[in-house]
Amino acid sequence: MHMKFEYDKEADAAYVYLVYPIKAGQAKSNIEIKENIILDFDSKGKLLGVEILNASKILNRKALLNTQVL
């Protein structure tokens, strides 16, 4: 499994790719498992990635500083 983590500082959103790259339209459904934490799935139910909104309030600041920033 190839994992990738990105952080968009302007949007304060992080994304953990469990499949990379995710092609346009590949994510067919999502579930918000907790406020601001969303799981993306393909058409077969395979977990593609995790989106974290308001990431700076949820994730460790050090972790965000050590990620690829968009």
Residue ranges and their predicted role:
Residues 22, 54-57:
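A short acidic/small-residue loop/turn micro-motif
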Residues 57-69:
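A short, polar/charged loop-to-alpha-helix boundary motif
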Residues 9, 41-42:
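Short, acidic, Ser/Thr-enriched surface-loop or helix-capping motifs
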Residues 29-33:
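Short loop/turn motifs at secondary-structure junctions and domain boundaries
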